[in-house]
Amino acid sequence: MVTTYIKSDLQLDGRQFFQPKDNLKMAELFMECEEEELEPWQKKVKEVEEDDDDEPIFVAEIASSKPAISNILNRVNPSSHSRGIKNGILNRGFTASFKPTSQRCLNSASNPVAALPVNFHPESRSSDSSVIVQPFSKPGYVTNSPRVLSNNSSELLFDLTQDTGLSHYQGGPTLSIAGLNETSFLSKRPSGSDISSVNPKKPKPSENTSGIDASSVISSEKSPSVISLQVVPSQGANCSSSQSKNGTTFPRACPKCDIHFNLLDPLKNHMTYCCPDMINNFLGLTKADNLNSANEAKTLESEKGKLIMLVNDFYYGKHEGDVLEEQKTHTTFKCFSCLKVLKNNIRFMNHMKHHLELEKQSSESWEKHTTCQHCYRQFPTPFQLQCHIESTHTPHEFSTICKICELSFETEQILLQHMKDNHKPGEMPYICQVCNYRSSLFSEVESHFRTSHENTKNLLCPFCLKVIKIATPYMHHYMKHQKKGIHRCTKCRLQFLTCKEKMDHKTQHHRTFVKPKQLEGLPPGTKVTIRASVGPLQSGSSVTPSISPSTSTLQLSPPEPDNVTAKNHVKLTTSTPNTTISDPSKANETKSNGSKSKNKSKVSNMQKKQSTLSSSNKKSKVNTALRNLRLRRGVHECIECSSEVKDFANHFPTYVHCSFCRYNTSCSKAYVNHMMSFHSNRPSKRYCIFKKHSENLRGISLVCLNCDFLTDVSGLDNMATHLSQHETHSCRVLVEQVSVCIPTSERLSEIKTEAPTKGQEPVSKETARHSRAEGEPGASHSGSKQDKVPSSEEGTGCDASVCEAAAATHCEKDVTVSDTENVSSSKNILSHDPDVGTDTMEKEEKTHHACQEMELKVDQSSESTNPTEAELSSETRQGLQLTSGDVGIDQFLRQGDEPKSVNSDASDPGSVRLEPLTPSEVLEYEATEILHDGDDPSANTSDTVSDQTGGSPGGSNPCRAETAVDLADGEERS
């Protein structure tokens, strides 16, 4: 809420003009205007001949020999009409209060008058002065064209507008204080407290008359709807021009969709989206009118020692530079990247920009979603980037945008503070290095280069405005700007490759280049008021929240204490933080310092409340359907991110599309995981969204039945691509129960090193035969021939090959094995496989236990027999030939290189091979194995028999016993 007090001392030759009966020495006129609603209906100040006021809010007419400069007042809420009035009687002074009802009152402190209308005629020789308060029979009618009652009267007529209607007063030529027409709501927005007064020509002295010292106060910038009153001379029928040139009254309709609006602000906001090309013509706004009204305001204010300037005139400007006729060369440029030849420099620059966009799209970088394509700034999130583009890089000009930085701010007050802290008057940081053309706007320099330096050798860098004349260095320079080591200027949009270039740019170019013309020739000490715009504030930049409908109450009250005046004066100064506003009373200015901090805190609190209200309204509009959604009781889990959904409106804020692929989602977490997992440059830091369910996918592999192509779960897309390329091929899914403790990479290496699919059936046949041979003569032969065991290397290799063959038969579900015992034993092996390899503590315990057992057996044995290596090798080969049948030796030995499938018994030599042992430990186990096999063959035989019959899982490996039986058969036959 912005409150303005206007103090007007009316005196002539030391005598008072209005002198009440309570013998006050001076009648002081205080006008309090409270603004509660944003309504941009303020119009351009014109003389009566050109006045086109469609909605006159306040009209006053004063007859005088010379016109006085006008006042600009604010509209107020009718809820404040009772202030200073008690039981229909004013407290003191000379007060007129307007109400939206039919009752109106005008009286002095001692003589209240209840009848309406009331004419107050002070005694005067030269002219009669009357004050008329116009009654309203209904609150919804408006007086559009007031006329005076007599030719020689001086009237002050107050007129309130709420709706449409007409009421007339007839009279002759007078002076008119006319409200602004609707064409000036964009061309003039008074923001500071600007005081200007003109002393009219003094008439002859009389008893109760005095001259008029008209003091005008321009309303605060933070008042969204402003009424401008101008005292202008009017003669004859000119006083009724506001009625004849009013045009259509509200409600108005959109010219495109014919939707009716009662207020101008909603209509303007609607037209910006519906028909932005028709808004200027529809509202009758031209650039010339804007400049004329701004120049008139500056001229009037400069007469009183104060200058009011706009941000565009004070900070922005351009310099034409050197006027040189550059020779057109029509040089062609070749792109070394795509080898395309461009006809001129402008086309080559466009081609490089196109290359940059393609590179960003193909790089799958997260920066593409957060970098502005207009000013190349980076933002934390794509949402902030979208907000920046919509608020800054738009065809519509907003009064909260810094055109130098190309940034948008929340309010005009924040913009003014930013301009004061970062920029200088007449600052032009963007320079054309060819002709020294300068401007405060980057777009002007770029368009100047494209028009003035076309068909030349010059190539302009859009990042730092550097000019290069050769294509290859220009491309290298252009691509260097894409690296992360660039240096951005904090006061404009340029970015440089070195820190020195950035510092030179800041010191040389971010300062006043050309002093504004309005500041030339001003006397020292002139106070300059800077405003963001002359039109009304945008709907989102008002300081006070819109609570009540736009109605106006004007209250004339006697002087109040100084502290109240000081507080209201501070409210004016806070609207323009970089301006010092003069006040007629020095005492009020000194006393206002104490209350300045309090009022600033109030303004900030109101801004916070308004922002929270607007944000909550936006959120409620977006999530209306989700907030009203009825759900069942219990825990709801998101199927995309596997997290609990507590608030559906917050968990699913909006529907987003991935720009790289066809992924669409409403879950914000799932979108972030998708972008980081599939479109990030760092695969090591990818987020796995299926972390909880990843163990279920392990052990699944896909194999092509027509070729050797094999892949795991992570290569499903590769298998799909393979099958699409080979239409005759088909694949099979192999599922294996894999424990969580086995790492995935170990299993993948095991699958990928297996034999091709074509060779799997012979291997399974060999395994089946091998298992049958295992059950028939195994127990009888192993008792007597167990002392001839081959060396640890060959024996272990044979065991591993046979066990791996058995494991392969279990992994493939399509291969059937006739021997049920062998299948059960292979499952037993696979079930114990995971318990061996990963748990370090179990390894150490089992290894320590095995060492103790072997040491005890070595102590008990007294003799050991070691057959020669040649005999063992020949016996082993014979045994392998018998067991392998028709399987080739190359194919069989190839399986020996595969990872071993071992039992959980750590005392078995086969399982020891997989443990991470040092060479010394390996030698120790080999020695103890030989001693153990030679000394106690009966123990191994019993273990073998127990394993073959499906004994306890703690026994020896059946593959080991199987190999021992085959070796024994080979010895007998030899």
UniProtKB/Swiss-Prot annotation:
There is a cross-link at residues 44, 46, 86, 99, 138, 201, 222, 245, 287, 304, 752 (Glycyl lysine isopeptide (Lys-Gly) (interchain with G-Cter in SUMO2)). Keywords: DNA-binding, Isopeptide bond, Metal-binding, Nucleus, Phosphoprotein, Repeat, Transcription, Transcription regulation, Ubl conjugation, Zinc, Zinc-finger. Residues 571-587, 612-624, 817-829, 861-884, 938-950 have a biased composition (Polar residues). One of its GO terms (molecular function) is DNA binding. It holds the Pfam family DUF4195. It is found in: Nucleus. The keyword Cell inner membrane does not apply. Its main location: nucleus. InterPro entries: DUF4195, Snail/Krueppel_Znf, Znf_C2H2_sf, Znf_C2H2_type. Residues 539-557, 591-611 have a biased composition (Low complexity). Residues 763-775, 830-860 have a biased composition (Basic and acidic residues). Residues 188-216, 507-624, 751-797, 815-974 are annotated as: Disordered. The modification Phosphoserine is found at residues 557, 904, 907. A zinc finger (C2H2-type) spans 333-355, 370-393, 400-424, 430-453, 459-481. One of its GO terms (cellular component) is nucleus. The keyword Phosphoprotein applies. May function as a transcription factor. PANTHER family: ZINC FINGER PROTEIN (PTHR24388), ZINC FINGER PROTEIN 280D (PTHR24388:SF34). This is Zinc finger protein 280D. It comes from Mus musculus. The gene is Znf280d.
